[in-house]
Design a protein with these regions (language model features):
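Active-site-adjacent bridging/hinge elements
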Residues: 20-38, 126, 159, 165-172
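A penicillin-recognizing enzyme superfamily signal
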Residues: 5, 51-212
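Repeat-unit-sized solenoid/scaffold elements
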Residues: 26-46, 184-197
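Glycine-centered secondary-structure boundary/capping sites
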Residues: 12, 24-25, 34-35, 175-177, ...
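Active-site-adjacent helix/loop patches that line small-molecule binding or acyl-intermediate pockets
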Residues: 1-27, 38-66, 112
Length: 212
């Protein structure tokens, strides 16, 4: 965390927030949707204090996987009326959010966290030695996360201790599935769930392995 704080002091919060917003990052709280709000625009934002939704995180990771091209998540890909005529669907508004070289540099760092000995994301490595770009995360023992991507596929998983009152009902000193831990981290629940989904889905669609 200290390295992130040092980086933020050199780059400046405005530049960081601008880049994050371009990549689709925003606060999920209904009354504080702007990343520049007092709730979000603070030095700790660099270590993940903005309350982003799983969909937002998946979109940000997708932007990095697409060489910096950000597209608004659209659930509908095609609509036809009863006569078979196509109905216009919302645009994904795809645009170059960040420089491709920057996106590739971040992606390289994500992959190194997977492949390097002792890497914090080493448990995210997918089957068949498929090149994996992922990151685990934990926030005050209230949320466990894992997000990541391979070419043309991205996913984000979040486990919340108590959606109604996460501050007072944390993962601290909990027994889950017969396992007790004083503290729970992203690698314990979020990573296995993310990894199982990715492996199952990639196998089901016969996704080619692209490790370039």
């Amino acid at each position: 965390n200290t390295t992130q704080a040092s980086m933020a002091s050199n780059i400046g919060l405005c530049a960081i927030a601008d880049a994050a917003k371009e990549m689709g990052y925003h606060n999920a709280i209904s009354n504080a949707s702007d990343i520049y709000s007092a709730n979000s625009f603070q030095p700790p934002m660099t270590i993940g204090t903005v309350q982003a939704s799983p969909l937002t995180m998946a979109n940000v990771y997708a932007t990095m996987g697409a060489n910096g091209v950000e597209c608004t998540p659209i659930a509908i890909t095609k609509v036809t009326d009863r006569s078979g005529s196509k109905v216009k669907v919302p645009s994904a508004n795809c645009h170059q959010a960040i420089d491709p070289d920057i996106a590739q540099t971040v992606s390289y760092a994500l992959n190194q966290g997977v492949v390097q000995p002792g890497g914090e994301a080493s448990t995210t490595q997918l089957d068949n030695n498929r090149k994996t770009f992922a990151k685990t995360g934990t926030n005050e023992n209230t949320v466990m996360t894992t997000a990541g991507f391979v070419p043309n596929q991205v996913a984000a998983f979040v486990a919340v201790a108590d959606a109604q009152d996460p501050i007072n009902n944390t993962f601290d000193n909990k027994t889950i599935n017969g396992v007790y831990r004083p503290s729970w981290y992203g690698m314990y629940i979020a990573t296995p769930a993310w990894k199982q989904f990715m492996n199952t889905y990639l196998a089901a669609i016969n996704a080619p392995i692209d490790n370039d």
